[in-house]
């Protein structure tokens, strides 16, 4: 089944291909997203004449190719393996996995709505046009809220099911914000006061933001590191901002001077 809206890929486009047959002069590849057969010449697969084509591909392998020529009239497509960079391969494989996953989710949605399964593909194409990666809409529903669907030309019932499926099926990687705390004291028992201030800072953050993992540890006096980790990016941002406010309030109590500087990831 064709996963993409257009019938043929463009020259230079990255495509997902499953190796079907290895021949003397190359490999026949099934383009999974286009429901087409393509050919990869040997010189576009092997990196060196000292190697065999089977050192790079085997029947049944699914990997990323780059389109080098297209003849729609003859329905002939040629692809290259060796022209694909590692970073391109990773991004393309991720997009493909997302397309497959979104299509399955939308097929569930169509079943709930008693609509033809074929509509799922059209909705996926629309979401991809709007977001680049169709899975991003599900991630954004979880990350920032259902309002991301407000401007989409989808009916209300479908939006409700997308929100429901996103909350059930999508688990975002945790957001982590780190910073360096520089804190000093001019008091005779300054070490103990710094320790007490940092303990209270950590305790207060954990009480105010129980859903956020808070860790403070020494880098090398007067530098300490704070790590805040949570599932909701806005909550982690709020906790980091509050950490600076709490530290400022603790300076007078413990007679210390300190600040927090964010570590840019």
UniProtKB/Swiss-Prot annotation:
This is Translation initiation factor 2 subunit alpha. The gene is eif2a. The keyword RNA-binding applies. Heterotrimer composed of an alpha, a beta and a gamma chain. The keyword Nucleus does not apply. GO terms for biological process: translational initiation. Belongs to the eIF-2-alpha family. Residues 12-82 form the S1 motif domain. Keywords: Initiation factor, Protein biosynthesis, RNA-binding. GO terms for molecular function: ribosome binding; RNA binding; translation initiation factor activity. eIF-2 functions in the early steps of protein synthesis by forming a ternary complex with GTP and initiator tRNA. It holds the Pfam family EIF_2_alpha.
């Amino acid at each position: 089944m064709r996963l993409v809206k257009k019938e043929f890929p463009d020259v230079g486009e990255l495509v997902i291909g499953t190796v079907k047959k290895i021949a003397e002069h190359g490999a026949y590849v099934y383009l999974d997203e286009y429901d087409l057969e393509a050919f990869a010449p040997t010189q576009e697969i092997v990196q060196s004449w000292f190697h065999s084509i089977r050192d790079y591909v085997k029947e049944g392998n699914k990997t990323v190719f780059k389109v080098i020529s297209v003849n729609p009239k003859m329905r002939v497509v040629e692809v290259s393996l060796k022209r694909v960079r590692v970073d391109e391969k990773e991004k393309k494989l991720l997009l493909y996995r997302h397309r497959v996953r979104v299509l399955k989710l939308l097929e569930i949605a169509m079943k709930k709505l008693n609509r033809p399964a074929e509509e799922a593909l059209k909705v996926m194409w629309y979401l991809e046009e709007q977001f680049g990666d169709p899975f991003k809409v599900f991630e954004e529903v979880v990350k920032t809220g259902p309002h991301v669907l407000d401007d989409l030309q989808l009916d209300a019932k479908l939006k409700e099911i997308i929100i429901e499926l996103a909350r059930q099926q999508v688990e975002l990687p945790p957001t982590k914000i780190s910073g360096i705390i520089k804190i000093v004291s001019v008091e005779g028992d300054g070490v103990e006061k710094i320790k007490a201030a940092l303990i209270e800072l950590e305790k207060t953050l954990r009480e105010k933001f129980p859903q956020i993992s808070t860790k403070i540890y020494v880098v090398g006096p007067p530098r300490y590191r704070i790590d805040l980790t949570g599932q909701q990016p806005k909550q982690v941002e709020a906790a980091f901002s509050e950490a600076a406010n709490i530290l400022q309030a603790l300076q007078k109590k413990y007679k210390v001077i300190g600040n927090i500087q964010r570590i840019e990831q």
